[in-house]
């Protein structure tokens, strides 16, 4: 058996298990030869090409490798896997199980006094859709999350703005280059009172990490929505950047993961809320 490590969209379960068995010494009658980088690296570095490609200089050329490499940040992981033999260390199967998600169901959420609403908007990368979610702090300090809707982008932004007019709306976090600038402009023109955040990549990474941390830490609550459960119980991690950050993909072919992304953004806004500063008037 030979080949490259599994990619983020091809789990390669048999290959992964065989490697683990041999490297751990549990398989006595098999050997393993590997040319790979231990960490995510600069795939455009020719020195690393020679360290990880034994056929380079004979049947493989530098020109061939150079032509295969991508230019964007998102291609970095795949380039490392395909050309530097990088093995992704996190579990590329389901990131959140159905049982883990159902453990957080609540039937009658009680809102905190003077509660604030935090909205997350995600423009899908794989489909022409946009999803909206909301998060709010409960009376017991848990964070309640809810998926509001996922609609085609062509339906325009009026339906989103309708929710943002809520008098308790505090912040809306909008992610997705496909429409965040237009939505920001529409919100401002509609004179909605809520703060608008267009998160940086580092903040999206933080939002996803915090969502899972609080989910597994029993801080998140939800109302058992079938569409949201389907998205969350069929998700997998996708690497973002070079620092171990992750986002989400769906393990179901043709499925939209933006509902989960929107929920994670809304939760992030709520979890980081410090409360309104009281105005002090001195005479």
How would you name each of these model-derived features?
Residues 3-4, 36-39, 83-85, 122-123, ...:
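Active-site proximal loops enriched in glycine and acidic residues that flank catalytic Cys/His/Asp
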Residues 116-134:
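An active-site-proximal beta-strand-loop segment
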